[in-house]
Amino acid sequence: VRRQPIVKWSRAPEGPLSAIFAVATVARGGHYAAVRLSGRVAVKGENDPMAAFWMPFTANRAYKAKPRQLVSASGMYYRSSDGREILDGTSGLWCSNAGHCRPEITDAIAKAAATLDFAPTFQLGHPLPFELAQRLAALMPDGLDRIFFTNSGSESVDTALKIALAIPRAKGQGTRTRLIGRERGYHGTGFGGISVGGLVNNRRAFGGGLPGVDHMRHTHDIARNAFTRGFPQHGAELADDLQRLVDLHGAETIAAVIVEPMAGSTGVLIPPVGYLQRLREICDRHGIILIFDEVITAFGRVGGATAAGQWGVTPDIITMAKGLTNAAVPMGAVAVKRELHDAVIESVPGGIELFHGYTYSGHPLASAAGLATLDLYARDGLFDRATELAGYWEDAAHSLKGRRHIIDIRTIGLVAGIELEPRASAPTARAMELFHACFDNGLLVRATGDIIALSPPLIVEKTQIDEIFGKISELLADID
């Protein structure tokens, strides 16, 4: 009779996961097998319940040595695993614009899951994405009324780039294959996005990226624009980099240029007065498609449904995600001018016009979440609320001018970037130390380089704005 394996029970992990995981390993000839306990499975050969998850954009070893776990959320607050309330100063990752766990959205998702859990949109359809596309089109600048659904901002960008390459080919301009991005641009982590993006660390480990890509300079200029409220006065001439690239490569080789109207992830880089308008003029002059990456700026962040509409510059394509579903279900979208959409559709005599898509494009749960989110934005007037609060937010942010280490403050809409002087021996360390100090004291901020980026849910109250900047001011005093 074969003997049963010996079960060796380990001590439950300490810290934030102690109440969640119980781990057992089965010894058998020196190897370990997984044992299911209370619905959990221990990883083969390991006794660490955090080891399996390879975390994105994270120093995994440092995090897992001292984890910071969020276990629930409501309104303006997260709750940590040790029971503390954490005021959300970043809308999660620029995405929970209406606040957390809004029942209007979660109920819509539950209803959709119980009605139609999945339906393909390849050669079939279901009603929700058609309805959502109409609702989205109505929020876009005039003419951008054709909507393609994705599952993330990265997918939205790669979709937009592929559409931008398909359009000139459909028009018989097949030499237009070049894409233009910008230094310090962030356009997600797909191969298209990292290629047009201007962040070397996002490309370094992955080869050369797409061929035929060039970059304009960024607009960040502390020397001339420090402590600007709203649009900086200096730097519109940097848009002429696009004309320089036209002169270098030939307009007939350039398909599209992509920029974030406001670069959020790389430190709240706000466009100078006239910059976006000049880009639009150069694109018009040379027949170049202009793409605005509004994954961050869409859905109220700068006070309107889109930065394009709010700031009066209409691109040819807009990418979206994040606030589209209030981050309750992953979803992205691409809005395209009707005449450009029609050029692709009409270039094919029959059959599939664009060989591109995703299994989950227009997913029922995501579409339901999107519709409920748009309803909530409209019912509560959150875009207008962001505009109304912008002045108070701006004053509170700029009240930190003169505080220790601060070399610049930038604000627009309900966004702020607080730039810290880099520590000579350890660039980026100050912002990361402030990030940790804020979390330990009940405030979530975002550290990007030497910049603290802030973008609270649009439901933020003035007292909470005071708390955000008050804590930052207080905690900066303890940062070397």
Regions found by a protein language model. Name each.
Residues 1-3:
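Polybasic, low-complexity intrinsically disordered segments
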Residues 20, 25, 31-40, 46:
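Short, positively charged and aromatic/hydrophobic N-terminal segments
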Residues 43-480:
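Conserved N-terminal phosphate-binding loop of PLP-dependent enzymes in the Aspartate aminotransferase
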